[in-house]
Amino acid sequence: MESLAALYKNHIVTLQERTRDALARFKLDALLIHSGELINVFLDDHPYPFKVNPQFKAWVPVTQVPNCWLLVDGVNKPKLWFYLPVDYWHNVEPLPTSFWTEEVEVIALPKADGIGSQLPAARGNIGYIGPVPERALQLDIAASNINPKGVIDYLHYYRAYKTDYELACMREAQKTAVNGHRAAEEAFRSGMSEFDINLAYLTATGHRDTDVPYSNIVALNEHASVLHYTKLDHRAPSEMRSFLLDAGAEYNGYAADLTRTWAANNDTDYAQLIKDVNDEQLALIATMKAGVSYVDYHIQFHQRIAKLLRKHQIVTDISEEAMVENNLTGPFMPHGIGHQLGLQVHDVAGFMQDDTGTHLAAPSKYPYLRCTRVLQPRMVLTIEPGIYFIESLLAPWREGQFSKHFNWQKIEALKPFGGIRIEDNVVIHENGVENMTRDLKLA
């Protein structure tokens, strides 16, 4: 494989091309991209954890340093002003020398407010991209050039097409997340609490709670029915029935986002349902290809859910077609089949149909689907179907013409297990699909 340095060099070439096109289209001279600033907790003197501007880390793998600035014009070597204060209270990152620094001009910035003296005097045609508009105004950036929608839409649209460097980083993030999932399963099998399972995951991945790309979902038993459960009980339940883990990792600012579900006892209907969801997920991935709308795969999985609901006699005496048509599958899988993945977990521009930002909303029947794009090579997506037993979603079906088709006794027996979700991260290629997660032998 090419070195990361060689891949990064080509990555910068691609970003420069996109920048040139965006600047020409919107009649700007350059973009000033701000890493962000620390924000103090209200009425306190310590900051919230720092989260870098995604458009900043698209250029450089600097994710932990506030008050940094990039100036890019699509022609000249990108300039990075790297915040390097004299500070004995806090850790100060040294000026970077790494695989990427040959491609960027790195300049020390000793004072956070010193950037003004470093920038070109004429700034009327510079666009600011960052989270602190008032800082841009202080630098005499025109208000109309602060986070200009057209520029951001353009950059967001093309972020769906990953460079080879980005794919390499995402494969590394997968490796880290897979290590965490293996450690977490072991912790579950040994009877640990959600809190301690989470610690095992973080230890195996070398991440802090603030390093993971999203809050880990570590859900035992009925907690698996809460789609974004993040509480972390300190005590293990008296009876272990099920474990759903939705947890990722980061590498150079790029995310992995994996989910697995395990049964404590493999001789149960629930354990067989996990196996069947897993098999259907793999079968769907095997059909994926460029040129097909992501929405189609979401709808297809509802047909697969219907098949499983019939097979397990959770819904009875109604055809699979009628189940999907009347949305009897909806309460069992209330979320979308997945989303784009990259610098952000729910990566941007999932609804964008072109580089002018044309929006195509999710179908009204499936409002929580996060992507409506036609799949193209270099796109990275999650495929994360699930089946859940959520009373608030099932309750409306307890009355009405379809109630008789729900096997309420079976549903009550499955509710203590919470639910099931299986999630892999896939890359669309010209001639097929790469499953980065299964390539690492994560069952």
UniProtKB/Swiss-Prot annotation:
Mn(2+) 2 binds at D246, D257, E423. One of its GO terms (cellular component) is cytosol. GO terms for molecular function: aminopeptidase activity; metal ion binding; metalloexopeptidase activity; phosphoric triester hydrolase activity; proline dipeptidase activity. It catalyses: Xaa-L-Pro dipeptide + H2O = an L-alpha-amino acid + L-proline. Binds 2 manganese ions per subunit. PROSITE patterns: PROLINE_PEPTIDASE. It comes from the Bacteria. Its cofactor is Mn(2+). Its EC number is 3.4.13.9. It is an enzyme of class 3 (hydrolase). It holds the Pfam family PepQ_N. Belongs to the peptidase M24B family. Bacterial-type prolidase subfamily. Splits dipeptides with a prolyl residue in the C-terminal position. PANTHER family: XAA-PRO AMINOPEPTIDASE 3, XAA-PRO DIPEPTIDASE. This is Xaa-Pro dipeptidase. It comes from Citrobacter koseri (strain ATCC BAA-895 / CDC 4225-83 / SGSC4696). The lineage of its organism: Bacteria, Pseudomonadati, Pseudomonadota, Gammaproteobacteria, Enterobacterales.
